[in-house]
Every structure is written in structure tokens, then in C-alpha cells.
Amino acid sequence: MSNDIFPNKFKAALAAKEIQIGCWSALASPISTEVLGLAGFDWLVLDGEHAPNDITTFIPQLMALKGSRSAPVVRVPTNEPVIIKRLLDIGFYNFLIPFVENVEEAVQAVASTRYPPEGIRGVSVSHRANMFGTVPDYFSQSNKNITILVQIESQHGVDNVDAIAATDGVDGIFVGPSDLAAAFGHLGNANHPEVQRAIQHIFERAKAHGKPSGILAPVEADARRYLEWGATFVAVGSDLGVFRSATQKLADSFKK
């Protein structure tokens, strides 16, 4: 059976340093995820860390994005091999790994997504990712088509950014601005000069190692500044944020 799984176009675009504009899907709804996919974003994060998602909610969202130009990226709840294996088996190819602080954690994230001998991913011969055994080249192509994006959002992560960025199999470095701000003692203020310097430093070190960098920036001025600083994959909003803002504006227009 033919398939359109390989090659991974999002992974190729990142490697080519093409600008990739994304959005966050936080409502855990296949309807809202489908709407985001229709909007034309290059990539969408389906959030498993802070949104109420699990395996059973992710599958209908993946189905909703079938045929969309938007590449689904799953943010896993934690850097744990069994969780990552299950998300691979349901059909994710692009992974955002939160709270990576050192090279050992980066290596573990990569290994969790690779079949032996390159990694430790468990083997099932029939699952959703290989169209239930109907993709003949799945096992030969899977390892080279997985995207690993690691999130730096702590002081230790910043201190170890060079080693993390140099890790084989890491495709990009993503900044978690809110947790990074908290780690630097500026909870709720990612625009504090100290945090901004750290963000710019991460972008610069990623570039020095030939890796693209990204960030979540729902404020347009922030997003444009980060693009100017060299970030190439930027999430510029979320379904939850857009929905809350638009509904509040609508209510206010009639109640004030």
C-alpha cells in the first residue's frame, strides 16, 4: 500500500531553516484542532503536558488533521520512553520534549523514538502509525523520519545548551519562555531583560550548532522579535487564547 508518511516534510523544512509558523492546540478537541489545520499553519502542537490530552484524545485530533498542511507535533507530558512509544504507535512523528536540562536527557529522548540498534523503541508489527501493517517500508524509514525538538526552560538547560544542541538526533531547540522566566526568578514576566537575554543566547547557540530554534510567542511583537533574532519555528498563538480573547471581546462589545 502506498503512503504519504515519508519523507517527513516538517523535519525537512526545519533542516532547511525554512520559517515555520505554528499554533498551539490546547482545547483537546478534534473540532478546534481541525479548524487550526484549515487555517494554514505549518505546524500545530497538540499539548500533552498542560492540556487535558491523552492517547484517546490525541487519535481523533490526528484524524482531524489528515490531509491538512499542518504538521502535528506532540508535546509529551514527560521524557519517558513508554509514553513516547505509545505516541509513536498512534501516529506521531514530531515530538516536543519538555524540560530537557542536559545531554543525557536529550540522548534519552532521541533513543526513545528509534528502533534498535539506534534506540530503544519497542516493536509492534501492526499499529496506527504503520497503517496497521500495510506500510512495507515503515521499519526501514521510521528512524530517519522522526523529529525531536527539545525544550529548554531552566537555568540548567541554558547552562548546557551547547551540549544539548550538539546531540545527534536533536532536530531543534525550543524555548519554554514561561518556565524559563520562573527559573530566573521572574515568574509571569518572560519579557524581563534577563529572560530575554537568555532566550537570545539559546537562539545563538542553537544556530552555532546548525540547529533551528523555536518558541511560543502569542504576542505578535514578541513573535516578530524572535523571528528577527533567528528563530525559525514560532508558535504565534493557541486555540484557547484566540477563543478566550474573541469571546471576551464579543461579550464586552454588547455589555459595556
From Swiss-Prot:
E.C. code: 4.1.2.20
Q: How is the cofactor bound?
A: Binds 1 Mg(2+) ion per subunit.
Q: Where is this site: Increases basicity of active site His?
A: D89
Chain positions recorded as Mg(2+) binding sites: E153, D179
Which GO biological-process labels does this protein carry? D-glucarate catabolic process; galactarate catabolic process
Q: Which residues form the active site?
A: H50 (proton acceptor)
Q: Which cofactor does it need?
A: Mg(2+)
Pathway stated in the Swiss-Prot or TrEMBL entry: Carbohydrate acid metabolism; galactarate degradation; D-glycerate from galactarate: step 2/3
The protein's matches in SUPFAM superfamilies, at most eight in alphabetical order, are given as: Phosphoenolpyruvate/pyruvate domain
The UniProt entry, under InterPro entries, shows: Aldolase/citrate-lyase_domain, GarL, HpcH-HpaI_aldolase, Pyrv/PenolPyrv_kinase-like_dom, Pyrv_kinase-like_dom_sf
The lineage's top-level taxon is Bacteria
Residues of the signal peptide: none
Q: Which UniProt keywords apply?
A: Lyase, Magnesium, Metal-binding
Q: Which residues bind substrate?
A: Q151, S178, D179
UniProt GO MF annotations = 2-dehydro-3-deoxyglucarate aldolase activity; magnesium ion binding
Where does the record place the site Transition state stabilizer?
R75
The top EC class is lyase
Name the GO cellular-component terms. Answer: cytoplasm
- Catalytic reactions of this protein: 5-dehydro-4-deoxy-D-glucarate = 2-hydroxy-3-oxopropanoate + pyruvate; 2-dehydro-3-deoxy-D-glucarate = 2-hydroxy-3-oxopropanoate + pyruvate
Read off the NCBIfam families from this record: GarL (TIGR03239), PRK10558.1 (NF007849)
- Protein family according to the UniProt entry: Belongs to the HpcH/HpaI aldolase family. KDGluc aldolase subfamily.
UniProt-listed PANTHER family: 2-KETO-3-DEOXY-L-RHAMNONATE ALDOLASE, 5-KETO-4-DEOXY-D-GLUCARATE ALDOLASE
The UniProt subunit note reads as follows: Homohexamer; trimer of dimers.
Q: What is this protein called?
A: 5-keto-4-deoxy-D-glucarate aldolase
